């Protein structure tokens, strides 16, 4: 990494993640998926190498991008057994450390979950507080929202789930 004498005051990053659902409609009420750290009862499972948390994957990707550290796939490749079934909060914590090493803090995060099912908004506040807890970011600077694709494409056919995140990083003082 080159040393900059004029570090930008602000940097913005965007992240994206998508995972397929399994094809089995599981009637087992113990089946759940994890989104932004919160377990949600759902009749399908996410197919993933780690815990498959698209919200936190997108957030980690956005943080890494904001500070010029590449992508989540570069730091936590799905070909590495070390990350098998890993909790996605670990990815966000490590991305946050990279930002801090480069002189930045996360000032704001906006995460959108894209799916037809399950419904996300009943869990949004809990997700916001979960992320705030392990990142030490004020919950009012974390936003969680959800949308559908109006039944268009693979996500519209409920074959998977996606997330996008954008973060604003500011210079540490």
Curated annotation (Swiss-Prot):
A Pfam match is YgbB
Q: What is its EC number?
A: 4.6.1.12
Print the keywords alphabetically: Isoprene biosynthesis, Lyase, Metal-binding
Identify the residues that bind a divalent metal cation: 17, 19, 57
Decide whether keyword Ribosomal protein is in the record.
no
Q: How is the cofactor bound?
A: Binds 1 divalent metal cation per subunit.
Enumerate the residues marked as the site Transition state stabilizer: 49, 148
**Binding residues for 4-CDP-2-C-methyl-D-erythritol 2-phosphate:** 17-19, 49-50, 76-80, 147-150, 157
In this entry, which stretches build a coiled coil?
none
Biological pathway: Isoprenoid biosynthesis; isopentenyl diphosphate biosynthesis via DXP pathway; isopentenyl diphosphate from 1-deoxy-D-xylulose 5-phosphate: step 4/6
Q: Which cofactor does it need?
A: a divalent metal cation
Family in the record: Belongs to the IspF family.
The UniProt entry, under NCBIfam families, shows: ispF
- In its UniProt entry, what is this protein called? 2-C-methyl-D-erythritol 2,4-cyclodiphosphate synthase
What is the protein's species of origin? Ehrlichia ruminantium (strain Gardel)
